[in-house]
């Protein structure tokens, strides 16, 4: 019988990806609960109302008004019927996000990378929101057009459309400058770029977290050292690794990173044990050689 050996670093990377997926689902559910906090109020009990309000008979006034206007009865009945058929879009959106979270966890278990899954999920969520929650830009234009005076419309009918378009363009430009860049463009240019770089660096470091690398010692020999001996969180190691020249560009392109150079960089600034063992002059030369070799590939 042949035995199958599983690399512990692969298990750690998979567990970290699953934790990130679970945290993402929890964050989405928490945001939905915060947005629906106004819908979770307790109902008002009739017994807790004052005595004067209890004595009011609402049915009489309502029946008289309905009898006087039979057309209102039909309109209200039709409106109530239409409102019953329409479901709350927030509830549909919450169920949609729950299904998205389940799909993310399933894809993570198959071995796909978290950033690839998350980028596709973001596009799906944005398209869903754009279809089911359209912006109300038409209402703003109608309100602005009604503010024009009738005198200008009568005297200068040809110039009013141009003025209105100029006003709308100015207000739109002012709104854009005040609110900053659009959410989609901002996320694709900055947030997703940083997240992809950090995810790639964390993935490669996690794969070789227990691998030992050779470093020159003070006693003209060598010693072995790995990322586990740093006793640091993976997030802190990633932040320090981004300050190494050339690492960010390599991670953005999905290329292999000089992990020994990163380990030497982080260890020389955050590990006293590493500082006591390593020969600083030879370490600088090795780190520079590793960077040149990986950048030239």
Curated annotation (Swiss-Prot):
Residues spanned by motif Nuclear localization signal: 211-214
GO molecular function: RNA-directed RNA polymerase activity
Domain of life according to the entry: Viruses
CDD domains referenced in this protein's UniProt entry, alphabetically: RABV_P-protein-C_like
Biological process terms in GO annotation: symbiont-mediated suppression of host innate immune response; symbiont-mediated suppression of host JAK-STAT cascade via inhibition of STAT1 activity; symbiont-mediated suppression of host JAK-STAT cascade via inhibition of STAT2 activity; symbiont-mediated suppression of host type I interferon-mediated signaling pathway; viral transcription
Segments for region (Disordered): 136-191
Annotated motif Nuclear export signal, positions: 49-58
UniProt KW keywords: Chaperone, Host cytoplasm, Host nucleus, Host-virus interaction, Inhibition of host innate immune response by virus, Inhibition of host interferon signaling pathway by virus, Inhibition of host STAT1 by virus, Inhibition of host STAT2 by virus, Interferon antiviral system evasion, Phosphoprotein, Viral immunoevasion, Viral RNA replication, Virion
GO CC, one annotated term: host cell nucleus
Record-linked SUPFAM superfamilies: Phosphoprotein M1, C-terminal domain (SSF118173)
Compositionally skewed regions (Polar residues) per UniProt: 136-162
Entry-linked InterPro entries: PP_M1-like (IPR004259), PP_M1_C (IPR037199), RABV_P-like_C (IPR049506)
Residue positions, PTM Phosphoserine: 63, 210, 271
Oligomer and partners: Homotrimer when phosphorylated. This trimer is stabilized by binding to the L protein. Binds soluble protein N, and ribonucleocapsid. Interacts with host STAT1, STAT2 and PML.
Function in brief: Non catalytic polymerase cofactor and regulatory protein that plays a role in viral transcription and replication. Stabilizes the RNA polymerase L to the N-RNA template and binds the soluble protein N, preventing it from encapsidating non-genomic RNA. Also inhibits host IFN-alpha and IFN-beta signaling by binding and retaining phosphorylated STAT1 in the cytoplasm or by inhibiting the DNA binding of STAT1 in the nucleus.
Protein family according to the UniProt entry: Belongs to the lyssavirus protein P family.
Protein's name according to its UniProt entry: Phosphoprotein
